[in-house]
UniProtKB/Swiss-Prot annotation:
One of its GO terms (cellular component) is cytoplasm. Mg(2+) binds at residues 31, 46, 48. It comes from Rattus norvegicus. It holds the Pfam family Arf. A lipid is attached at residue 2 (N-myristoyl glycine). InterPro entries: P-loop_NTPase, Small_GTP-bd, Small_GTPase_ARF, Small_GTPase_ARF/SAR. GO terms for molecular function: enzyme activator activity; GTP binding; GTPase activity; metal ion binding; phospholipase D activator activity; protein domain specific binding. One of its GO terms (biological process) is protein localization to Golgi apparatus. This is ADP-ribosylation factor-like protein 1. It is a peripheral membrane protein; Lipid-anchor. Keywords: Golgi apparatus, GTP-binding, Lipoprotein, Magnesium, Membrane, Metal-binding, Myristate, Nucleotide-binding. The keyword Membrane applies.
């Protein structure tokens, strides 16, 4: 009975945790972003084998954030986590010109999945503090983002280590999620 009332309360007042996946190739900065969002500072990370899951509160909204490993051997398992996802933060290393094609292939395959049909897409053009970084518009074109017609998406210039661009990206995500409900 208590569960019934708490679910009514949650639906009326929007206290449900939003489910967000942080995806991208290995070394893009996914785990650094997760912990920067959660604790507000850079923490030492190691390559993610499997996943990290944390609750992040941003602007009074609670997010259950899943950071999935990006190694070639782990990417096929991403689909196991797609169900009930509200948004995908897709992190791309702006300096990794050699693998932008692989990043695009993974993004396209992911967006074709039925379980992610309604998920909002936020692309973090990460490592923008580096001199050789591609611009967000170069990256958007390389990833084929302008061709996405039936998907709410945005790309942001970010640096996980410096913390730049994360607030703007999260602000957009929060507003987009709120307007969708």
């Amino acid at each position: 009975m208590g569960g019934f009332f708490s679910s009514i309360f949650s639906s009326l007042f929007g206290t449900r945790e939003m489910r967000i996946l942080i995806l991208g190739l290995d070394g893009a900065g996914k785990t650094t972003i997760l912990y920067r969002l959660q604790v507000g500072e850079v923490v030492t990370t190691i390559p993610t084998i499997g996943f990290n899951v944390e609750t992040v509160t941003y602007k009074n909204l609670k997010f259950q954030v899943w950071d999935l490993g990006g190694q070639t051997s782990i990417r096929p398992y991403w689909r196991c986590y797609y169900s009930n996802t509200d948004a995908v933060i897709y992190v791309v290393d702006s300096c990794d010109r050699d693998r932008i094609g692989i990043s695009k292939s993974e993004l396209v395959a992911m967006l074709e999945e039925e379980e992610l049909r309604k998920a909002i897409l936020v692309v973090f053009a990460n490592k923008q503090d580096m001199e050789q970084a591609m611009t967000p518009s170069e990256m958007a074109n390389a990833l084929g983002l302008p061709a996405l017609k039936d998907r709410k998406w945005q790309i942001f210039k970010t640096s996980a280590t410096k913390g730049t661009g994360l607030d703007e990206a999260m602000e957009w995500l929060v507003e987009t999620l709120k307007s969708r409900q």
